[in-house]
């Protein structure tokens, strides 16, 4: 089951999270890092490791003496070519981004008349479109959050969907996504977490389609949240429209170098091997959470969405024990019953704390 919320513009887009003690816009701008303090065991943020790999740190550090130099066309081309080779695309189908989130901030340049966003999902697309005065309709999926293309408005000329989706972790079939294509419509697929799925079987990143825009993040996989790196894949025409209003030199040399390095064959192979290990770890974590009464949403992302009795009370209890998880009620389509936890090797600590919470009868 699902329903459609909208049309709304401005802060009214976010009245589904009015239970928060913040403004609706602030609730939508809430992200997992706000739950994390120094020394906390972090299950709230979906960055893979505590720091980038040493080889990447060395490569970026070697460029520090060159920071007086403006980014060159060659720097941009090296980044584009690495991405193009990784996905079997051409250079002019690649747009380096300041994180995948910049891609959402640029969507208003496509001048959509009616945008549809499949939710629960990352909140930035709705914020960016609303800020530009563009009507955004939420297509709200009900548990188990499986995509039903029939409920996306036929007249939507921009459709945004995540795959796998943050925060639900659900991985939609590529055939379902392709069903969303329509004449005059651009389909935007947020694949920020696609490279965490072994083999990436449902990805559209390798498909040269004139009406499909794929957004990718390197921030999470390579632990570069402080640098902000990602890219878009699309037709040259769509990318030109997307960047019609964009600052000059949008990415610095460190960002462009990171994109090229993280899309090199050896790095891609390392990330793929890590994705296999992560999938096994996720299965163990899911079993552990279910053993203490959590209802876990079936998914394939590097995080787990689950609902549990008195989730808000549990979150506060975990926080008192130095454990951070992500609240779910700031996402349109979720409520206070839901929590999201990143897949971490330390998952037994989280499960043990939940078990202790339950043993106490839900009391601190």
From Swiss-Prot:
Pfam families: Aminotran_1_2 (PF00155). It is an enzyme of class 2 (transferase). Its EC number is 2.6.1.9. One of its GO terms (cellular component) is extracellular region. GO terms for biological process: biosynthetic process. It is found in: Secreted; Secreted, Cell wall. SUPFAM superfamilies: PLP-dependent transferases (SSF53383). InterPro entries: Aminotransferase_I/II_large, NHTrfase_class1_PyrdxlP-BS, PyrdxlP-dep_Trfase, PyrdxlP-dep_Trfase_major, PyrdxlP-dep_Trfase_small. Its main location: secreted. The modification N6-(pyridoxal phosphate)lysine is found at residue 220. It catalyses: L-histidinol phosphate + 2-oxoglutarate = 3-(imidazol-4-yl)-2-oxopropyl phosphate + L-glutamate. Induction: Up-regulated during macrophage infection. Its cofactor is pyridoxal 5'-phosphate. Gene3D superfamilies: Aspartate Aminotransferase, domain 1, Type I PLP-dependent aspartate aminotransferase-like (Major domain). Keywords: Aminotransferase, Cell wall, Pyridoxal phosphate, Secreted, Transferase. One of its GO terms (molecular function) is histidinol-phosphate transaminase activity. Monomer. Was identified as a high-confidence drug target. Belongs to the class-I pyridoxal-phosphate-dependent aminotransferase family. Aminotransferase that catalyzes the conversion of histidinol phosphate and 2-oxoglutarate into L-glutamate and imidazole acetol phosphate. Might play a significant role in mediating histidine biosynthesis during infection. Facilitates mycobacterial survival and virulence in macrophages. Rv2231c is recognized by host TLR4 receptor at the macrophage cell surface to regulate downstream signaling cascades. Inhibits macrophage activation and production of pro-inflammatory cytokines to dampen innate defense. Can inhibit macrophage apoptosis. This is Histidinol-phosphate aminotransferase Rv2231c.
């Amino acid at each position: 089951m699902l329903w459609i919320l909208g049309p709304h513009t401005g802060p009214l887009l976010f009245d589904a999270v009015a239970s928060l003690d913040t403004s609706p816009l602030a609730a939508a701008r809430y992200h997992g890092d706000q739950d994390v303090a120094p020394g906390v065991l972090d299950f709230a943020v979906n960055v893979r490791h505590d720091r980038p790999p040493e080889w990447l740190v060395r490569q970026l550090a070697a460029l520090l003496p060159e920071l007086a130099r403006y980014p060159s066309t060659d720097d941009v081309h090296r980044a584009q070519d690495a991405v193009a080779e990784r996905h079997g695309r051409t250079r002019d189908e690649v747009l380096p981004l300041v994180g995948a989130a910049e891609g959402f901030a640029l969507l208003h340049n496509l001048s959509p008349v009616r945008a549809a966003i499949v939710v629960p999902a990352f909140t930035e697309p709705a914020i960016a479109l609303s800020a530009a005065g563009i009507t955004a309709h939420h297509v709200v999926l009900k548990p188990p959050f499986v995509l039903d293309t029939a409920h996306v408005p036929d007249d939507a000329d921009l459709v945004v969907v995540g795959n796998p989706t943050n925060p639900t972790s659900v991985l939609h079939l590529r055939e379902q996504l392709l069903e969303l294509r329509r004449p005059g419509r651009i389909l935007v697929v947020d694949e920020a977490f696609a490279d965490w799925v072994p083999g990436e079987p449902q990805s559209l990143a390798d498909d040269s389609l004139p009406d499909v825009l794929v957004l990718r993040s390197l921030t999470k996989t390579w632990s570069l949240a402080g640098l902000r790196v990602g890219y878009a894949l699309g037709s040259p025409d769509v990318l030109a429209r997307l960047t019609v209003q964009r600052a000059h030199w949008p990415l610095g040399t460190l960002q462009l170098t990171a994109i090229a390095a993280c899309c090199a064959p050896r790095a891609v192979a390392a990330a793929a091997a890590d994705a296999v290990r992560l999938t096994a770890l996720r299965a163990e974590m899911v079993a552990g959470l279910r053993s203490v009464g959590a209802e876990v949403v079936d998914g394939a992302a590097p995080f787990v969405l689950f609902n549990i009795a008195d989730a808000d009370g549990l979150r506060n209890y975990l926080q008192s024990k130095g454990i951070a998880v992500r609240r779910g009620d700031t996402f349109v389509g979720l409520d206070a019953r839901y929590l999201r936890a990143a897949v971490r090797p330390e998952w037994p600590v989280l499960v043990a704390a939940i078990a202790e919470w339950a043993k106490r009868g839900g009391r601190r």
